[in-house]
Amino acid sequence: MSLQPLSSCAATATPFNRHIPFKGISNFRDLGGYRSRDGRKVRWRVLFRSDRLSDLQYEDQESFNRLGVRHSIDFRSEAERQNSDYAIKSLQRTVLPIEPYVTQTLHRMIELGQTLDVATAHQLMAQTYEAFVQRNTKQYRAFFDVLLTQDAPVVFHCTS
């Protein structure tokens, strides 16, 4: 299934705002409204993506709870989880670490004293996106298994 944004015609007025503002989280988004190749759409308020949930502020808890999210899928590495872990009472968490290829390569470049130019950055990002798919098939399969078995809204996130 390929997700594409709805066209820009007037009929695309959304019933909800895609960006959901929180004081501590800067990039919490509703993925509802995206259309698949066969014309079906992702339902609003059932699938969210976010940056670190560890930054959710106490004042944000009520708004977060109103969304009804009961499951989080945490794509962060073990080191990232240790640096900024979270515990939200109403949330069951599935940890599916996806190590970004670009991080390992950048560390190697720094160790070797190499500099990063625009062309190399573009190449690294392309390789990273390929590696996400090639190296993390089990994690993505588990991700979709969770999505298909949940009867409440789900949020997935990485560090950002």
Report the location of each language-model feature:
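Cys-dependent protein tyrosine phosphatase-like superfamily
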Residues: 1-155
